[in-house]
């Protein structure tokens, strides 16, 4: 008989697995299984932009990015849904389950988990999160599963009649909105760099929200780091959540962060 858990919001850890570290995901999967066996409630959100780009290129489809996010026309949206909601999501779930864990793969569409609207028509079908319905997450967590979430979301607000029912929303953004909605203890962003660096390329181990905002305004945080910093700012804006950006390529980076901490860049309220 499967164990039922009583989950307190402040215990939950939200993890964003960046697509750029998928070639090195073996220890991350091991860490997820290890933490689950310790009854650590985890929510895993994944990306996979590089894999989507590969499939688009194989189909001779153009793809462009703006400030670290994909401009998404209808063809790109279909590819994002198929690759992230299908292939990538199920590979991660299969790896966790065959590794001794218990995971369920979903997207932001399932249970109306992530509901959004189009952000900017120039970005195509890229959305902002308007609402998080955590009902399905609660059921999965209390049933002892790790929810593995693909960043495809429900086009629930202000949808023109001919528009798709789906939206592409950045995985960092989704992870942050979930962390904020459930009052997570920590949001951990696993990426392919060891944190945020200053203009002299020195690692910044700890930042206040004000300091992080200054890095965005000055352009020091650029490219793919922009949505990550914005995600951290969202996660810590109204909760006691701590956000950490770490190098997921490092062996057992996730396990080390949860059990000891101290690597990468931490953004938190200090007041």
Residue ranges and their predicted role:
Residues 1-271:
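C-terminal catalytic "cap/lid" subdomain
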């Amino acid at each position: 008989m499967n164990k039922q858990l009583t989950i307190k919001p402040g215990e939950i850890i939200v993890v964003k697995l960046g697509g750029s570290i998928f070639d090195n995901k073996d220890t991350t999967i091991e860490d997820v299984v290890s933490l689950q066996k310790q009854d650590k409630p985890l929510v895993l959100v994944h990306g996979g932009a590089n894999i989507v780009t590969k499939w688009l290129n194989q189909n001779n489809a153009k793809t462009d990015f703006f400030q670290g996010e994909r401009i998404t026309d209808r063809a790109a949206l279909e590819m994002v849904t198929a690759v992230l909601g299908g292939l990538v999501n199920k590979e991660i779930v299969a790896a966790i389950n065959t590794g001794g864990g218990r995971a369920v793969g979903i997207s932001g569409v399932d249970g109306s988990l992530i509901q959004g609207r189009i952000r900017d028509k120039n970005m195509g079908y890229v959305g902002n999160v308007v609402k998080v319905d955590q009902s399905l997450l609660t059921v999965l967590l209390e049933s002892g599963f790790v929810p593995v979430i693909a960043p495809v979301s429900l086009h629930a607000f202000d949808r023109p009649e001919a528009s798709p029912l789906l939206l592409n929303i950045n995985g960092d953004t989704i992870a942050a909105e979930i962390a904020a909605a459930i009052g997570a203890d920590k949001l951990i962003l696993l990426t392919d760099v060891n944190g945020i660096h200053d203009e002299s390329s020195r690692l910044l181990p700890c930042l206040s929200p004000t300091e992080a905002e200054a890095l965005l305004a000055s352009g020091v945080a650029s490219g793919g780091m922009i949505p990550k910093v914005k995600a951290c700012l969202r996660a810590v804006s109204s909760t006691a959540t701590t956000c950490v950006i770490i190098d997921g390529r490092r062996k057992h980076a996730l396990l080390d962060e949860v059990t000891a901490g101290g690597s990468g860049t931490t953004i938190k309220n200090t007041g």
